[in-house]
Amino acid sequence: MDKASATANSHEADAFSRKAAELVARHRIDPAALVDRDHDELAVREISLGRGAYVRGRLSLLTAVAEAHDARVVFASTPTGTVAYVAGHVSDLDVVEVMYTSLHAQAASQMSAVRRTTGAATQRYRRSFLFGYADRVATSFEDARTAAAAAAP
């Protein structure tokens, strides 16, 4: 994910992100890891999504990442902005946090590179982009998980 975040090329970032998703999916399907999983290690993490025009898009991205890793998301509006609560196994939450942070940085970088003729048009484009990006991420994770399951012994 570090390589994906470090590049300015969106195609290269996408390739690195797909590879990271593939590696995570492959290691999640390891039967030894599933047997050793301690069901008492459930937790809830709080992730601030802030305020503004892109909160729902950020929530959509976080949900796509969390659901791909068997975690669930709920959110609340607070006086300081929107807060998401992600529930799942601690090891899954660690992955969700890293993946979401990296993917959000990549999306922000790609969104900031585009300007439309007006501020409102730019905002609409960026909002649409973020929802589409979240959908593409969800599809990528699902494809990686399916491939890892097919390759598992």
Regions found by a protein language model. Give the residues of each.
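Short coil turns that connect the paired helices of HEAT/ARM alpha-solenoid repeats
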Residues: 6-8
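Short, charged, amphipathic alpha-helical segments
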Residues: 12-19
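…; additionally, a secondary subgroup of soluble metalloenzymes is captured
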Residues: 10-12, 25
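Long, charge-patterned amphipathic interaction tracts in eukaryotic proteins
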Residues: 25-153
